[in-house]
């Protein structure tokens, strides 16, 4: 948790927005819990937290296990305790309570914008490329949505129970069903294959990395991609991995990618679109305005382009190769150091 907070500080610095960075959480697992149980936990959590947060203090947002529902419960309890209404206390809120449009899918959208610029820098085009995605939550949903919008072909999504291979590429109808799967709390990706048996093939206890692809997008949780997975990806023809989940790749996997000609970009740069859009939500709250989807998307795209430019600036080696890990670390550190 401490290291995630450390990483968050540099990630927020990369966004160019005036935000610090921190991480927090609990060991409460919402899987299998009723709405009432989750609400009671969120209320109890906020009962201890509310004095430590505020629109000009610390501003929590969602992450693994915390989506719009949980943010809504937390926000409602805060307003009750504070006895005055503040829209900017949390981000990731519903639109009714001062949330920003596109916030749920922002991490995935931003990741694909970054990937698009990375490929362009390497002289490649994202159109027609095959993509494997781990997970089927908000991040994976956003990534899959933007991937097909940009012309890529998503050939695999995975969950705790296994992987679904989609030979002809994921469709809009399948992407919409990902939200139904997540809302069911079953946590089983096999439901996708059961819903679309003609297009999907489910394999139990396998990862998305077992499916041949051009681009791998870890979108689930930290340390999900091991060195063995990296080797399997390389063997199956993968030549690019963009880390969408926080610290999704184990250090040995990153070293393997870097030493074997696989383009790799770290999570602190790739997934910064989520926190960047939280920053945009804070701006809208401060202005008491709600922007249209086109404006939020355009600002997000601009931020991700800026992050990519910073990575290239600080990560370009003497031979012209770009070390995105080094570039992201130096760019983030430079801003934090200058602020201090």
Which role fits each region the language model picked out?
Residues 1-4, 74, 111-119, 143, ...:
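Buried hydrophobic packing segments
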Residues 1-101, 335-340:
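N-terminal ligand-binding/catalytic initiation module
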Residues 118, 232-340:
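Adenosine-phosphate binding glycine-rich loop
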Residues 57-61, 85-90, 133, 156-159, ...:
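General beta-strand structural signal in soluble alpha/beta enzymes
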Residues 16, 53-62, 85-88, 122-130, ...:
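Flexible, glycine/charged-enriched surface loops at secondary-structure junctions
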Residues 91-94, 99-212:
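Glycine-rich phosphate/diphosphate-binding loop of Rossmann-like nucleotide-binding domains
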Residues 162-264, 269:
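Rossmann-like adenosine-cofactor binding region
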């Amino acid at each position: 948790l401490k290291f995630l907070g450390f990483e968050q500080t540099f990630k927020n610095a990369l966004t160019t927005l005036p935000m610090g960075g921190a991480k927090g959480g609990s060991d409460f697992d919402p899987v299998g819990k009723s709405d009432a149980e989750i609400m009671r936990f969120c209320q109890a959590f906020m009962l201890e937290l509310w004095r430590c947060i505020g629109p000009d203090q610390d501003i929590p947002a969602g992450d693994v296990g915390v989506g719009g529902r949980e943010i809504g419960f937390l926000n409602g309890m805060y307003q009750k305790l504070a006895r005055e209404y503040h829209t900017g206390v949390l981000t990731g809120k519903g639109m009714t309570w001062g949330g920003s449009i596109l916030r749920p899918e922002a991490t995935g959208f931003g990741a694909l914008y970054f990937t698009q610029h990375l490929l362009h820098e390497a002289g490649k085009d994202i159109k027609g490329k095959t993509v494997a995605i781990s997970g089927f939550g908000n991040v994976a949903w956003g990534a899959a949505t933007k991937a097909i919008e940009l012309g890529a072909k998503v050939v695999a999504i995975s969950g705790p129970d296994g992987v679904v291979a989609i030979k002809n590429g994921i469709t809009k109808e399948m992407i919409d069903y990902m939200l139904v799967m997540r809302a069911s709390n079953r946590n089983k990706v096999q439901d996708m294959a059961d819903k679309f048996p003609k297009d999907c093939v489910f394999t139990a206890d396998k990862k998305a990395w077992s499916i041949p692809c051009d681009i791998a997008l870890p979108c689930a949780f930290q340390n999900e991609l091991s060195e063995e997975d990296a080797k399997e990806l390389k063997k199956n023809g993968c030549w690019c991995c963009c880390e969408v989940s926080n610290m999704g790749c184990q250090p040995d996997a990153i070293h393997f990618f870097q030493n074997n000609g696989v383009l790799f970009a770290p999570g602190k740069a790739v997934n910064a679109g989520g926190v960047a859009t939280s920053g945009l939500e804070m701006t809208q709250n401060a202005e008491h305005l709600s922007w249209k989807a086109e404006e939020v998307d355009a600002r997000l795209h601009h931020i991700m382009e800026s992050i990519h430019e910073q990575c290239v600036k600080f990560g370009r080696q003497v031979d012209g190769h770009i070390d995105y890990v080094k570039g992201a670390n130096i760019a983030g550190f430079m801003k934090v150091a200058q602020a201090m």
